[in-house]
Amino acid sequence: MKMTKMTALLLAAAMALTACGSTAAVSSEAAASAVASEVTASPEEAAVEPAAEIAVTYPLTVTDQLGREVTIETEPKTLASGYYISTSLLIALGVQDELVGVEAKADKRTLYSLSAPELQSLPSIGTAKEFDLEGCAALTPDLVIVPAKLKDSIPQMEELGLTVLAVKPEDQDKLYGAIDLLAQATNTVARGEELKSAIEDNLLSLHEAIGDAEAPTVYMAGNSSVLQTAGPAMYQNYMIENAGGLNAAASVEDTYWAEVSYEQVLDWDPDYIILASDADYDVDSVLNDAALADCTAVKEGHVYQLPHAIEAVDSPVPGSFLGSVYLGSVLHPEQVSEQFYHDCADAFYTTYYGFTPASYE
């Protein structure tokens, strides 16, 4: 079932931040209250007329994010997603009811339990490392969406009669490309356009609020260790830039998490250390790490972890812009209030996932 289109909540949030501009008043209790009143209306109050449907004609030929031309013969009624990123996106597009199989460990995803709990009992079709070809084929989905990492397995999937799209949303533009691709494939183009506009509007408001504030240096630490960091080729780099920061690891050439030394971190001497959403260590362990005692971020107490209560916002999911908003509130608290981050999260998850967050961290 395709969800009703609503953007009023997100537009209200964007307007609220824009109105605050780049003044310190945005962080005041009164301003926060005013922003909250703009964006915490109930879904019924915020409902707007559904956007006009943009018809898709089948057979439809699209180009996926591996550059493959794929023809979808008829509108897909059953879907299988082997990737958390695509599953999250399909929920935002309102086609979760059409899913018949999802990636492994879906039962552990808080986002699913809050927005589409039925997905947690669907058959697993594996992971990017261990994809279950035969299990997926047995579900006879009309369309399968997989990560680009599975490119070598796609010919085998096609031999089993599956129609397959690969996604690789490794930067902001490619995230928009993935939204376009799946919206077109699932005949939810209008919904996809609204979703992109909501993300773009909020990022624009964030940029306008930050304005020409001085950009601090940010060290983005990885999931497994504080000595892992994200270079300019990773999605996290775009989050730092969106939040008005400079990536301390801008010189790193690795396309995945790079291993670095304590000496290198101290040489970069970042103003802030930000832990990945799914880090298996905590802020206190970094603050108490004697090897980092001379780092400016540690001395100033500027060590934070990205939100993870709902999902990892440093993954290229639709809600990843919230990671930028949160980071903006950390780096530029006089321009971007924590309340605005909360309001954006409320608006986004209510509109596109059907729930209001109980926790924001």
Regions found by a protein language model. Give the residues of each.
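Bacterial N-terminal signal peptides that target proteins for export
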Residues: M1-T7
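Hydrophobic core
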Residues: M15-A19
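Bacterial lipoprotein signal-peptidase II cleavage site
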Residues: C20-A30
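N-terminal low-complexity, Pro/Thr/Ser-rich intrinsically disordered segments
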Residues: V35-R68, I72-E73
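Extracytoplasmic substrate-binding proteins
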Residues: P50, I54, V62, E69-T71, ...
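A short, structured surface patch at a secondary-structure boundary
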Residues: S81-L139, L143-I145, K149, A248
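Proline-aspartate-enriched helix->loop->beta-strand connector
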Residues: I125-A128, L133-V146, L162, S261-D278
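Alpha-helical, coiled-coil/dimerization segments enriched in small aliphatic residues
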Residues: T229-W257, S261
